[in-house]
Amino acid sequence: MTTESQAAERLAFLAAEIARHNALYHGEDAPEISDADYDALMRENAALEAEYPHLVRADSPSKLVGAAPSGHLAKVAHAQPMLSLDNAFADEDVVDFVGRVRRYLSLGAEEPVALTAEPKIDGLSCSLRYEKGVLVLAATRGDGTTGEDVTANVRTIDDIPERLRGGDLLSSPPDVFEIRGEVYMAKADFAALNARLLAEAEDPAKARQFANPRNAAAGSLRQKDPGVTASRPLRFLAHGWGEVSALPADTQKGVMDAIAAWGLPVSDDFVRVDGAAQALSHYRAIEAKRADLPFDIDGVVYKVDRLDWQKRLGFVARAPRWAIAHKFPAEKAQTLLKDIDIQVGRTGKLTPVARLEPVTVGGVVVTNATLHNADEIGRLDVHPGDRVVVQRAGDVIPQIVENLSRDETRDPWPFPQTCPECGSAAEREPGEVDYRCTGGLICPAQRVERLRHFVSRHALDIEGLGLTHIESFFRDGLVQSPADIFRLTKDILLTRERWAEVSAGNLIAAIDAKRHPPLDRFLFALGIRHVGEVTARDLARRYRSWEGLKAMIDRTIEARDAAVQAIGETDEKFAARTAKELAAIVETPGVGPEVALALVDFFAEPHNADAVADLLSQLQPADVIHETRASEVSGKTVVFTGTLETMSRDEAKAQAEALGAKVAGSVSAKTDLVVAGPGAGSKLKKASDLGIAVTDEAGWAKIVADAQ
């Protein structure tokens, strides 16, 4: 049974993990997991929140949609949020959906519930705003409240008219009508695009190739240059609407018929059905011809047809109550497992990849499949040469789901204990399923990400040294490690394109200004797993200097090595027990076994130790000098919530810590003061329920001023 503390910890993990996958899928068009695995994470989050409603987080995935917009396109605030849909995975889920509609509307048992049903296109959500029938704005969904302005790009898509036409249903469209739908790429067009990109490449081995039609559509629409979008075969299908000044009908089908009459494409398989039985019959018909459709779909969407019922049903946090997406099961095929390779991700995770005899799954030729982790390899007992069942889950990432050649007399396939990229040790922490490379600072697979983190705002914060420059310097061999950043000179920069006297001088000055970073920023910049800003600050305050911190780390490494030597071969129970003992040596409030073990793994790796020593030849972390002022919040716990209008959250935190207060992220019985700005929600209510003192931003400013 899950305890409350375990549930809170798991919800925090799920919030971060789902946000990461949202960013990969919606923001970078590069998903790492299948739709089915993503849906499983969402269902786990929903189940925990249902059991522990008081633990629902402000950043809960149940409240969020998509991913934040990227930086290279202008942002657009949606007049009405572009929400996601809840999912159905079985016939019973659809029956339950109709039942919930009946109960919510208090309908009689004999009153029919009409639905619309249409294929769920696997594309990129887009809104088209027409004013007086003329297209004035197009935007991506983004995070649901803010998207990206893609108007210029959308104007190049043949399916999308510049001006709506009058139709048999309506002489002219309303003054304002925002049409929503999916930008997609047909399967044949996708294959032709990849073939053209391959033919046009100077080096075929380096040719840009899209993984699937959805990625191709998303990457093509979100271009800075509309000319690139125009060269890509994009299409559009309408499925709904957002802000409107008037509606042409009182049913979902009636409005969609009007949209089609105005000149926007609507699915040929959009129909009206009565109740769950007819909905499921249409689902079966669509599923049967799925492979023959010209575009990828991953299910069927049902919506309550009557708009007055839709209005009464309303919305939950991230989805309407009047609609649901009925997902298709994954498609499968048999093939030969030729080999198992290990890929190292940007964060050091080792992922086994199956190399397969080419096989067609759901109309797509599959040659690779994920094996997830060492435990999954053991569960399947797969070895090169086995016949396996491949599943194209969610139409995105193929995976092996069954081994047809299982032989329990064989030894398990040996998962590598060293990183194939750099040779550093691969470690698996207690309770985790993934092996990770411990050679973070020197591992080629991780270097660019580590370098980007090293110079980021909350780490060394080197102004003017962003990801583009990092990638360029790394590609040309100028910066391979953090220490190399400090070896750059103005003369080196001036030999490169687009660098002038002023820009080169400014960057070198910004780099030199960081040769004495605060100890906590230096520690955070190293990118040690589990050592975030707060943990780095706690360790820096406890040990005050790099010398003091390093002495503690050396003692911890010696203790770990002695324990291993005394007991010989280790297991997870031994590792967990040892980690607790190491945490006692670290002796820092808030730093537990997980962090202690991460510190040991990082600094005990010889490659990392060499990289840190090299870095210390270029800079010297500044010692921590406690400068707290006496104040009415000294020794107390403060929580900031809502919007701060005169300062950033980081500035407020720094002020509180300078006054000797501890800043917490959530309200509890141990909280002494809550500073609430506009938009404060559950934290403010909980503070009121617990009788905790509350002040606003002006009151906080007075506390700070009184301590001067």
Curated annotation (Swiss-Prot):
Q: Where is the BRCT domain?
A: 628-708
Q: Which residues cross the membrane?
A: none
Q: Which GO terms describe its molecular function?
A: DNA ligase (NAD+) activity; metal ion binding
Q: Which GO terms describe its biological process?
A: DNA repair; DNA replication
What cofactor is this protein dependent on?
Mg(2+); Mn(2+)
Q: Please tell me where Zn(2+) binds in this chain.
A: 419, 422, 437, 443
What InterPro entries does UniProt report for this protein, alphabetically? BRCT_dom, BRCT_dom_sf, DisA/LigA_HHH, DNA_ligase, DNA_ligase_AS, DNA_ligase_CS, DNAligase_adenylation, DNAligase_N
Quote the Pfam families the UniProt record gives.
BRCT, DNA_ligase_aden, DNA_ligase_OB, DNA_ligase_ZBD, HHH_2
The record ties this protein, via SUPFAM superfamilies, to: BRCT domain, DNA ligase/mRNA capping enzyme, catalytic domain, Nucleic acid-binding proteins, RuvA domain 2-like
The UniProt entry annotates the active site at 120 (n6-amp-lysine intermediate)
Question: What is the E.C. number?
Answer: 6.5.1.2
Tell me the enzyme class: ligase
Q: Name one GO cellular component term.
A: cytosol
Q: Where does NAD(+) bind?
A: 35-39, 84-85, 118, 141, 182, 303, 327
Catalysed reaction(s) here are: NAD(+) + (deoxyribonucleotide)n-3'-hydroxyl + 5'-phospho-(deoxyribonucleotide)m = (deoxyribonucleotide)n+m + AMP + beta-nicotinamide D-nucleotide
Q: Which UniProt keywords apply?
A: DNA damage, DNA repair, DNA replication, Ligase, Magnesium, Manganese, Metal-binding, NAD, Zinc
What exactly does this protein do?
DNA ligase that catalyzes the formation of phosphodiester linkages between 5'-phosphoryl and 3'-hydroxyl groups in double-stranded DNA using NAD as a coenzyme and as the energy source for the reaction. It is essential for DNA replication and repair of damaged DNA.
Q: Which family does it belong to?
A: Belongs to the NAD-dependent DNA ligase family. LigA subfamily.
PANTHER family, from UniProt? Answer: CHROMOSOME TRANSMISSION FIDELITY FACTOR 18, DNA LIGASE
Q: What is this protein called?
A: DNA ligase
- Organism of provenance: Rhizorhabdus wittichii (strain DSM 6014 / CCUG 31198 / JCM 15750 / NBRC 105917 / EY 4224 / RW1)
Q: What is the lineage of its organism?
A: Bacteria, Pseudomonadati, Pseudomonadota, Alphaproteobacteria, Sphingomonadales
Q: Which gene encodes it?
A: ligA
